[in-house]
Design a protein with these regions (language model features):
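Extended amphipathic, helix-rich lipid-handling scaffolds
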Residues: 1-70, 82-84, 89-90, 94-177
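Short consensus segments that form the blades of beta-propeller domains
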Residues: 73-74
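Short coil-to-beta strand junction motifs in C2/discoidin
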Residues: 78-79
Length: 177
Protein backbone atom coordinates (compact mmCIF):
# COMPACT_ATOMS: atom_id res chain seq x y z
CA UNK A 1 0.00 0.00 0.00
CA UNK A 2 1.30 3.44 -0.95
CA UNK A 3 -0.98 6.27 0.22
CA UNK A 4 -4.39 5.43 -1.20
CA UNK A 5 -2.96 3.06 -3.81
CA UNK A 6 -3.05 -0.71 -3.52
CA UNK A 7 -1.33 -3.34 -5.64
CA UNK A 8 -1.77 -7.09 -5.49
CA UNK A 9 -0.34 -9.90 -7.58
CA UNK A 10 -1.24 -13.54 -7.94
CA UNK A 11 -0.07 -16.60 -9.83
CA UNK A 12 -1.74 -19.71 -11.17
CA UNK A 13 -5.39 -18.70 -10.77
CA UNK A 14 -8.36 -19.94 -12.76
CA UNK A 15 -10.67 -17.42 -14.43
CA UNK A 16 -13.66 -19.00 -12.68
CA UNK A 17 -12.08 -18.50 -9.23
CA UNK A 18 -11.23 -14.85 -9.88
CA UNK A 19 -14.79 -14.16 -11.06
CA UNK A 20 -16.27 -15.82 -7.98
CA UNK A 21 -14.10 -13.56 -5.85
CA UNK A 22 -14.87 -10.25 -7.66
CA UNK A 23 -18.55 -10.83 -8.51
CA UNK A 24 -19.89 -9.40 -5.22
CA UNK A 25 -18.25 -6.03 -6.04
CA UNK A 26 -19.69 -5.77 -9.56
CA UNK A 27 -22.96 -4.06 -10.39
CA UNK A 28 -25.85 -6.20 -11.63
CA UNK A 29 -25.25 -5.31 -15.28
CA UNK A 30 -21.60 -6.42 -15.14
CA UNK A 31 -22.50 -9.61 -13.25
CA UNK A 32 -25.12 -10.54 -15.86
CA UNK A 33 -22.77 -9.74 -18.76
CA UNK A 34 -19.98 -11.91 -17.33
CA UNK A 35 -22.39 -14.73 -16.47
CA UNK A 36 -23.59 -14.87 -20.09
CA UNK A 37 -19.96 -14.90 -21.34
CA UNK A 38 -19.19 -17.84 -19.00
CA UNK A 39 -15.39 -17.26 -19.09
CA UNK A 40 -13.06 -20.06 -18.06
CA UNK A 41 -9.37 -20.93 -18.34
CA UNK A 42 -6.05 -20.23 -16.60
CA UNK A 43 -4.41 -17.01 -15.42
CA UNK A 44 -0.71 -17.78 -14.86
CA UNK A 45 -0.15 -14.17 -13.69
CA UNK A 46 -2.59 -11.48 -12.59
CA UNK A 47 -2.06 -8.02 -11.05
CA UNK A 48 -4.58 -5.53 -9.66
CA UNK A 49 -3.93 -1.87 -8.89
CA UNK A 50 -6.50 0.41 -7.25
CA UNK A 51 -6.80 4.02 -6.17
CA UNK A 52 -9.37 5.42 -3.74
CA UNK A 53 -10.91 2.04 -3.00
CA UNK A 54 -12.12 0.30 -6.13
CA UNK A 55 -13.47 3.39 -7.93
CA UNK A 56 -10.37 3.39 -10.13
CA UNK A 57 -8.60 0.15 -10.91
CA UNK A 58 -6.45 -1.55 -13.53
CA UNK A 59 -6.03 -5.28 -14.08
CA UNK A 60 -3.28 -7.03 -16.04
CA UNK A 61 -3.63 -10.77 -16.59
CA UNK A 62 -1.69 -13.31 -18.60
CA UNK A 63 -4.20 -15.69 -20.24
CA UNK A 64 -3.75 -19.35 -21.10
CA UNK A 65 -6.39 -21.56 -22.70
CA UNK A 66 -9.20 -19.09 -21.99
CA UNK A 67 -12.69 -19.75 -23.37
CA UNK A 68 -16.05 -17.98 -23.39
CA UNK A 69 -19.48 -18.23 -25.03
CA UNK A 70 -20.68 -15.84 -27.74
CA UNK A 71 -22.84 -13.12 -26.21
CA UNK A 72 -23.90 -9.51 -26.70
CA UNK A 73 -22.83 -9.53 -30.36
CA UNK A 74 -19.33 -10.75 -29.52
CA UNK A 75 -17.95 -14.07 -30.79
CA UNK A 76 -17.34 -17.06 -28.56
CA UNK A 77 -13.81 -18.42 -28.33
CA UNK A 78 -11.82 -21.37 -27.07
CA UNK A 79 -8.10 -21.61 -26.22
CA UNK A 80 -7.03 -17.94 -26.23
CA UNK A 81 -3.55 -17.15 -24.94
CA UNK A 82 -2.16 -13.66 -24.48
CA UNK A 83 -2.15 -10.61 -22.23
CA UNK A 84 -5.29 -8.79 -21.06
CA UNK A 85 -5.21 -5.30 -19.54
CA UNK A 86 -8.34 -3.39 -18.56
CA UNK A 87 -9.85 -0.65 -16.44
CA UNK A 88 -13.50 0.37 -16.08
CA UNK A 89 -13.44 2.45 -19.30
CA UNK A 90 -11.09 0.56 -21.63
CA UNK A 91 -9.00 -2.48 -22.22
CA UNK A 92 -6.68 -4.31 -24.56
CA UNK A 93 -6.13 -7.95 -25.47
CA UNK A 94 -2.78 -8.94 -27.00
CA UNK A 95 -3.29 -12.36 -28.58
CA UNK A 96 -0.60 -14.92 -29.22
CA UNK A 97 -2.66 -18.09 -29.56
CA UNK A 98 -2.53 -21.44 -31.30
CA UNK A 99 -5.32 -23.93 -32.04
CA UNK A 100 -8.13 -21.43 -31.42
CA UNK A 101 -11.83 -21.92 -32.14
CA UNK A 102 -14.05 -18.88 -32.75
CA UNK A 103 -17.85 -19.18 -32.71
CA UNK A 104 -19.36 -16.36 -34.76
CA UNK A 105 -22.79 -16.87 -33.16
CA UNK A 106 -24.61 -17.70 -36.38
CA UNK A 107 -22.83 -15.22 -38.65
CA UNK A 108 -21.13 -18.21 -40.30
CA UNK A 109 -22.52 -21.75 -40.53
CA UNK A 110 -19.68 -23.31 -38.57
CA UNK A 111 -17.14 -22.14 -36.00
CA UNK A 112 -13.73 -21.07 -37.32
CA UNK A 113 -10.66 -23.05 -36.31
CA UNK A 114 -7.28 -21.29 -36.46
CA UNK A 115 -3.83 -22.77 -36.15
CA UNK A 116 -2.60 -19.30 -35.17
CA UNK A 117 -4.29 -16.10 -33.98
CA UNK A 118 -2.03 -13.13 -33.27
CA UNK A 119 -2.62 -9.40 -32.80
CA UNK A 120 -4.16 -6.76 -30.57
CA UNK A 121 -7.77 -5.82 -29.93
CA UNK A 122 -8.50 -2.68 -27.90
CA UNK A 123 -11.87 -1.52 -26.62
CA UNK A 124 -13.33 1.56 -25.05
CA UNK A 125 -16.68 2.10 -23.40
CA UNK A 126 -18.49 5.41 -23.82
CA UNK A 127 -22.01 6.74 -23.22
CA UNK A 128 -23.37 5.13 -26.40
CA UNK A 129 -21.82 1.67 -26.26
CA UNK A 130 -18.66 -0.29 -26.81
CA UNK A 131 -16.08 0.22 -29.57
CA UNK A 132 -13.46 -2.39 -30.50
CA UNK A 133 -10.42 -1.53 -32.62
CA UNK A 134 -7.55 -3.53 -34.07
CA UNK A 135 -4.60 -2.27 -36.08
CA UNK A 136 -3.67 -5.86 -36.97
CA UNK A 137 -5.18 -9.25 -36.29
CA UNK A 138 -3.42 -12.12 -38.05
CA UNK A 139 -4.95 -15.57 -38.42
CA UNK A 140 -3.99 -18.74 -40.22
CA UNK A 141 -5.35 -22.22 -40.75
CA UNK A 142 -5.15 -24.88 -43.44
CA UNK A 143 -7.57 -22.90 -45.68
CA UNK A 144 -6.06 -19.40 -45.59
CA UNK A 145 -3.74 -16.87 -44.01
CA UNK A 146 -5.16 -13.44 -43.33
CA UNK A 147 -4.51 -10.09 -41.73
CA UNK A 148 -7.41 -7.84 -40.72
CA UNK A 149 -7.81 -4.41 -39.17
CA UNK A 150 -10.63 -2.02 -38.39
CA UNK A 151 -13.32 -1.42 -35.81
CA UNK A 152 -16.59 -2.76 -34.52
CA UNK A 153 -19.06 -0.52 -32.69
CA UNK A 154 -21.62 -2.22 -30.44
CA UNK A 155 -24.14 0.46 -29.50
CA UNK A 156 -26.32 0.06 -26.43
CA UNK A 157 -29.27 0.54 -28.80
CA UNK A 158 -29.37 -0.39 -32.45
CA UNK A 159 -27.34 -2.60 -34.73
CA UNK A 160 -23.55 -3.14 -34.61
CA UNK A 161 -21.43 -1.20 -37.09
CA UNK A 162 -18.46 -2.99 -38.67
CA UNK A 163 -15.61 -1.24 -40.48
CA UNK A 164 -13.21 -4.08 -41.24
CA UNK A 165 -10.55 -4.51 -43.89
CA UNK A 166 -8.17 -7.31 -44.63
CA UNK A 167 -5.86 -9.28 -46.88
CA UNK A 168 -6.10 -13.00 -47.57
CA UNK A 169 -3.22 -15.19 -48.73
CA UNK A 170 -2.86 -18.88 -49.50
CA UNK A 171 -6.63 -19.31 -49.85
CA UNK A 172 -7.74 -22.88 -50.47
CA UNK A 173 -11.16 -23.12 -52.10
CA UNK A 174 -12.92 -26.44 -52.26
CA UNK A 175 -16.35 -27.89 -52.58
CA UNK A 176 -18.19 -28.84 -49.40
CA UNK A 177 -19.01 -32.54 -49.37
Amino acid sequence: RAGERWRGEGRDWRVQDVLAWVTPWLDESARNWLASLDPRGDLPEIALETESGFDTYAVTARLHGVAGRSTHGLPGFDNLTGLLTFSPERGQLELDSQRVRVDTAGLLRLPLDFDRLHGTIAWQRDMDGLRLDSASLEMANSDFNGRFWGSVTLPDRGEPVLDLRGHYQDVRIGREQ
